[in-house]
Structures are given as structure tokens and as C-alpha cells.
Amino acid sequence: MLNALAMVQDTNVNRDSVAVMAPYFPNGDDKNYGYPWTDGLKAGRGSTTNALVWSGSQWSAGANNQYPHNSRNTSSYYILDELVRYFDDKTLFPNMKQIVLAGHSLGGQMLQRYAAIGDQLETESPVVLWIANGDSWAWLSDYRPLNVPDCPTYNDYREGFAQFVEYGMTYGASLVAQGLDAIKANFDSKQIAWARALQDFGNHASSCAPATTGQDRNERFFFFMKWFQPSCPDPSGTNCDTVDLVDAPHDNGQMFHSAAGLARLFTDNFYGDKSRAYDFGYPRKQQGDDPFPDPNLVNTPGATNYNTYAGGLTYQGCWTDQAPTTAQALSTLLY
């Protein structure tokens, strides 16, 4: 992130004018590295300090902490709330113009679910959630675009909102109890800068649920965009979504260093003038994935290969005449 900051051309955007903070959510793998641990004590008592520690990757979905054993009611999303409030405090940061929460991969998953159930903080400074290349998303409806019967847990939290409290959640429980319409309304009220690496076709799903929304990160992203389209009703307002398509693999450094990354993380609204860059990355992939279109590029054609092949076939972005069908020629077309 700091290396990316150093690449910004505007010399006013630097380490003296931009505060960068990376929160640390330790888990059991961090014993005696992130927090002290004493072997031989009763189960759950080995962590002997007030350090907040989470179970596995549950921090990424807002679950309560696992340690210390006598205080286990702190959600990782409460931590994000407090960080936002801290940087929004004008007595500490009188010149704060914008707050960006940035998450790549599992961090992106964290922020997408935070967008869905996160509290309305009523900040003075605009807040943007930069969400990039998550492996799965919490769906805002009971519908899934792909096969559901083979996955009875498809709608459990973190991919849906069933079994929410059972996951270890107290944060957002009252909102989730109101139902999906309330969750979606809360999600839609958040300002999200989506970032998608177009070379990222990875899949690290550990359950069947993500596969009901696509076979890999690429499919899952575009299915989510199709069903829950971002919007930018007022580019100078505080609820304008953007979607940036970046020619990169699953690499946070390349995402941060891209022109899109530099804009969303550092230069958008830097001077408090409500300015923001248009969506990056043309041609676009599907209808609805361009909430803040660049008027000079919006009509960029998708097909760049104009050759005619055997049988009069022309290239339209993917081959769909393969037999038998392969992963490169899916029966369900996304875009």
C-alpha cells in the first residue's frame, strides 16, 4: 500500500497527507507471535492477555473474538466501526476528506459482508469500501444462479444469512432478523469501489456454497454484479459505486498499483471537491457493470478479433461451440 502511495503523481498525496493503517486480526496460527500463549492450561485459557484473537478466518465475517476467554463479545466489524470513527474525529484529523476501507481477497470478503450488515455510522467524512477479488460473497437473496439441491448449506452465513447467530455473530443480528430486504437496503446505502482482476480465475472455496454462485472468483463476481447491480445516481454524492476492471492476476500489489487502485485508494476526493475518476477498464464485460461510465470509452467494442473462422464463426469473447462442453465453454453464459 505504501509503495502504491509513492507512485501517485500528485506530490500533495504523500505519507504526510495520507494515513495508512492495517488492522491485525490474529487467530490460533499466531500463538506466541501475535499474542502470548501458555501451553498446559485449561482448554481455552492459554491466551493470558487482553489481546483480541479470533477463531480461524471468522474475523473476515464479523464474528466475535475467541480470546480472551472472559471477554468474547467483540466483533471484528465493531473494530472496523471504531477505526472509522477514530479517523472521522475532526479533533484528531481536522483535514480528513475521505476514509477508504480497502480489502483484497479475504479482506474483500470481509468488507462485502461488512457492507451488508455494517452499522450506519453517520460520519462527517465520506466512507468508501474498496472491495477486490473476494473468493465468495454473501448473497442478498435466497436465489442462486447455479445448482442448489446438491448443497443444503448454500444459504448459511457467510454465503447467505441463515444460521447467522450460530456462526458466532452478535453484530448485525437485529438487522438480519429483519430479513433480506432490510439487509439489501443497508448494503445499497454503502459506497463501494469494486475492483476486479480479469486474470484471476482462482477458487479457494472450502464448502459447496460458493459454487452455487459460480465456479471461480471471476464467475462469482460477474454473477453478483448481474443480480445486485451497482449504481451511481450522483457522482458528486456519497453513494456512488464504481467498478474497475484491471488486467492483473490475484495480486494485491498489482491491484493497488494500477491506475484504478491509485484513484480509488488515494486521489478520489483527496481535496474534498467530491471528484472521482470514471470506471476503469474497457471494454466492459456485461450490462450493469459500469455504474460510472467513462463517456470517451463507454462504446468500446467488446470483440477485438474480427476474423472469420470455419463455418462462418466469428469471435465474440468466448468459444461456445465446443463439444463436449468444457470449463472454457460453460452452458451458462455470464456475459
Regions found by a protein language model. Give the residues of each.
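Residue in the alpha/beta-hydrolase core beta-strand immediately N-terminal to the catalytic nucleophile
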Residues: Q98-V100, V128
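Alpha/beta-hydrolase active-site loop
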Residues: A43-L92
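The feature captures the conserved acid-bearing segment of alpha/beta-hydrolase catalytic domains
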Residues: E124-D234
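C-terminal catalytic histidine-bearing segment of alpha/beta-hydrolase fold enzymes
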Residues: A195, A209, Q229-L334
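Phosphate/oxyanion-binding active-site loops and adjacent basic polyanion-contact surfaces
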Residues: H69-D81, D216-F221, Q254-L262
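Short glycine-enriched nucleophile-adjacent loop
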Residues: G108-Q120
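Gly/Ala-rich beta-loop-alpha elbow adjacent to hydrolase catalytic centers
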Residues: G103-G107
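Short, surface-exposed "cap/lid" segments of acyl-processing enzymes
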Residues: M1-R15, A22-T38, F201-S206, P210-G214
